[in-house]
Amino acid sequence: CIGYHANNSTDTVDTVLEKNVTVTHSVNLLEDSHNGKLCRLKGIAPLQLGKCSIAGWILGNPECESLVSKKSWSYIAETPNSENGTCYPGYFADYEELREQLSSVSSFERFEIFPKERSWPK
């Protein structure tokens, strides 16, 4: 046959639109491992939360204190099932909304409403 090449194959793949599509040739291009390094975007490093959740970082979990010094980032990397979340009992309402809001922010300033030095008696 002139004009095309085909081979017999029983390879099936899942595409964006269909599952188990028979193809004549397939190469798996998806990565199934990660080296742990995250890329900078426009020269700015990501904020890697490590064992902290976004809630633990924002609300001041003592285990997340090292993240307070981070002033800017290109994106936030939160690991699934982070150990250090909120350190008080209760449910964090609208957690997904907080994550969504922070996804478009590259920095913020944290301040104390009641500074310890001036607000509390010694």
UniProtKB/Swiss-Prot annotation:
Major localization listed first in the record, in broad terms: virion
Functional summary from the UniProt entry: Binds to sialic acid-containing receptors on the cell surface, bringing about the attachment of the virus particle to the cell. This attachment induces virion internalization of about two third of the virus particles through clathrin-dependent endocytosis and about one third through a clathrin- and caveolin-independent pathway. Plays a major role in the determination of host range restriction and virulence. Class I viral fusion protein.
Extra remark beyond the main annotation: Major glycoprotein, comprises over 80% of the envelope proteins present in virus particle.
Domain of life: Viruses
Biological-process GO terms, alphabetical: clathrin-dependent endocytosis of virus by host cell; fusion of virus membrane with host endosome membrane; fusion of virus membrane with host plasma membrane; virion attachment to host cell
Post-translational modification: In natural infection, inactive HA is matured into HA1 and HA2 outside the cell by one or more trypsin-like, arginine-specific endoprotease secreted by the bronchial epithelial cells. One identified protease that may be involved in this process is secreted in lungs by club cells. Palmitoylated.
Membrane topology classification: Single-pass type I membrane protein
Tagged with keyword Amino-acid biosynthesis: no
UniProt xrefs under SUPFAM superfamilies: Viral protein domain (SSF49818)
Zinc is among the record's keywords: no
Gene Ontology terms for molecular function: host cell surface receptor binding
Gene encoding the protein: HA
Subunit structure: Homotrimer of disulfide-linked HA1-HA2.
Taxonomic lineage of the native organism: Viruses, Riboviria, Orthornavirae, Negarnaviricota, Polyploviricotina
Classification via InterPro entries: Capsid_hemagglutn, Hemagglutn_HA1_a/b_dom_sf, Hemagglutn_influenz_A, Hemagglutn_influenz_A/B
Name of the protein: Hemagglutinin
Keywords: Clathrin- and caveolin-independent endocytosis of virus by host, Clathrin-mediated endocytosis of virus by host, Disulfide bond, Fusion of virus membrane with host endosomal membrane, Fusion of virus membrane with host membrane, Glycoprotein, Hemagglutinin, Host cell membrane, Host membrane, Host-virus interaction, Lipoprotein, Membrane, Palmitate, Transmembrane, Viral attachment to host cell, Viral envelope protein, Viral penetration into host cytoplasm, Virion, Virus endocytosis by host, Virus entry into host cell
Recorded family membership: Belongs to the influenza viruses hemagglutinin family.
Subcellular location: Virion membrane; Host apical cell membrane
One annotated Gene Ontology cellular component of this protein: host cell plasma membrane
